[in-house]
Amino acid sequence: MTIQYYFDLIKPGIVLGNIISAISGFLLATHHEHHINYIILMYMILGTTLVIASSCVLNNIIDRDIDAIMDRTKNRVLAKNINSCFVKNSIIYAIILNTLGFLFLGLTKNLLTILLTMIGFLVYIGIYSLWMKRKSIYSTIIGSISGSMPPIIGYCTVSHTLDTGAWLLFIAFSFWQIPHSYSITIFRSQDYKKASIPTFNIKKGIKLTRIHMILCILIFTLANISLTVLGYTSYTFLYIISIMSIFWLYTGWYQYKQLDNDLKWAKKMFILSIVIITSLNVLLSLDSIFIFY
């Protein structure tokens, strides 16, 4: 077992994306505080990073059998190394990461931050990974709850309360997650069929899946508009994210008919979802700085 093995086990890309979201939530909340507590920010980043990393390790352990079947995941470290020694060491690694993560979060002296992190962890591992992913077409909805936790954790580390801003972040990020995940399940549908994982598009069809995606994008857009209407973000934020969301809607509804190819359309929707969530995080971070300067 090399350092590279342990690094790959935490799914660094997923960890990085979630930490960027946590930082954007933290910075958004600072526009009410008018200053940034860099020590608390550091504790939040370290703690959240380690807990998310432990979640990814445990997910790798739980999914190692289906990961070995799917083309998209067959090269993950535990899919290639499924003997008991690798699994045992990975479990110990996850426990260490998780313990250190909550110790750092304890240094924030914010019980709400710790509670939200615990909820995100338990939902992702206990409900999504261990149960619903293999059993239900609605697993994506459950996964979106844990996926939306990082920005709320960052926000509440500053605000110490689940106010309207926190709930709007929850709505925006969770409803972004659904069309993002559905895009993957559409253009990787053969993988999911091969691993016998039920997905919404396989069971209900592409037409209904696309309608769900459009509705989620609309709710995502309305949540971002509400952030500006209620004074959490600027009109510059509103203009940029609204234009991007409208293009996402256009691609979801009209370009589906133009492309006449489910896989090409789903890949385009997936790429757009990455561009939009990255832009959202950048805009939330920069907007909060410009507001109090």
From Swiss-Prot:
GO cellular component term of the entry, any: plasma membrane
Leading EC class: transferase
Keywords from the UniProt entry: Cell inner membrane, Cell membrane, Heme biosynthesis, Membrane, Transferase, Transmembrane, Transmembrane helix
Location(s), subcellular: Cell inner membrane
Protein's pathway: Porphyrin-containing compound metabolism; heme O biosynthesis; heme O from protoheme: step 1/1
Catalytic activity: heme b + (2E,6E)-farnesyl diphosphate + H2O = Fe(II)-heme o + diphosphate
Membrane topology: Multi-pass membrane protein
Role, per record: Converts heme B (protoheme IX) to heme O by substitution of the vinyl group on carbon 2 of heme B porphyrin ring with a hydroxyethyl farnesyl side group.
Family label: Belongs to the UbiA prenyltransferase family. Protoheme IX farnesyltransferase subfamily.
Protein name, UniProt field: Protoheme IX farnesyltransferase
Organism expressing this protein natively: Blochmanniella floridana
Gene: cyoE
